[in-house]
Amino acid sequence: IKPVLSALFKSEHFFDMLNRGCLIKTPADQVIGSLREMNVQFRPETEWDTNYGLWNTFYSWMVNMGQNPHDPPNVSGMPAYYQEPLFHEIWINSDSLPKRNQFTDIMINTGYARNGFRVQFNCVAFAQTLSNPGNPNDLIDESLGIFFRNDLSAQSKGQIKTQILLTGQQWDYYWTNAWAAYEANPTTANFNTVNTRLKALFQYFFNLSEFQLA
């Protein structure tokens, strides 16, 4: 089977752009995927009570969004995998979509704590993993490359940059200077300046419909 898989993984079909962003994420993809994309770290495996308590919280979010991995409704599994004609579109409805947005909103703003340990989307730490976070255009492009399967238009990215990272200003140095000031002197005030904008940026990204696509 190795030659078959090798040919498949190197084929044009495997990398076809039409195969990206064509399915709605499962709740598991939404929850676990966002934790991985935001580089959320848990305690060492020896601290099982803390970890399992937090993992149970995230598991409950999957259930509330419509997917209980340990208890499928019947022998056929989850309807989104077989129910015609909707299939994966079943994952999104008037109840589940607000919960998806609520989950990422909570993870950005407060997160969850157990035994004195908090897990949260650390937006500043995430930005520091990017190649050029001081450049607002590169920051947006590289972040979207991680969060989204399909890119946004140049016009949309420009509006997002101006309204959020530049706080309504027109010049990139409003963000560049703020980031440089934090990097040179990470005081609480400088941290809050960049963190507030990054939290608003990522929360906006996570609430876009494009984020729901796999």
What are these regions (language model features)?
Residues 5-214:
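Flexible, low-complexity segments enriched for small/polar residues
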